[in-house]
């Protein structure tokens, strides 16, 4: 594993995980509101 590749992928992975977390949280709020 190249260290430079890891340095590039880490922020991208963090941003993707954060986005998915926020989308999931909002989706749960919408589902609770609907039911």
Swiss-Prot record:
InterPro entries: PSII_PsbY (IPR009388). The keyword Membrane applies. One of its GO terms (molecular function) is manganese ion binding. It is found in: Plastid, Chloroplast thylakoid membrane. Keywords: Chloroplast, Membrane, Photosynthesis, Photosystem II, Plastid, Thylakoid, Transmembrane, Transmembrane helix. GO terms for biological process: photosynthesis. Residues 1-4 are lumenal. Residues 24-35 are stromal. GO terms for cellular component: chloroplast thylakoid membrane; photosystem II. Pfam families: PsbY. Its main location: plastid. The chain crosses the membrane at residues 5-23. It is a single-pass membrane protein. Loosely associated component of the core of photosystem II (PSII), it is not always seen in crystals. PSII is a light-driven water plastoquinone oxidoreductase, using light energy to abstract electrons from H(2)O, generating a proton gradient subsequently used for ATP formation. HAMAP family: PSII_PsbY. PSII is composed of 1 copy each of membrane proteins PsbA, PsbB, PsbC, PsbD, PsbE, PsbF, PsbH, PsbI, PsbJ, PsbK, PsbL, PsbM, PsbT, PsbX, PsbY, PsbZ, Psb30/Ycf12, at least 3 peripheral proteins of the oxygen-evolving complex and a large number of cofactors. It forms dimeric complexes. Belongs to the PsbY family. This is Photosystem II reaction center protein Y. The lineage of its organism: Eukaryota, Haptista, Haptophyta, Prymnesiophyceae, Isochrysidales.
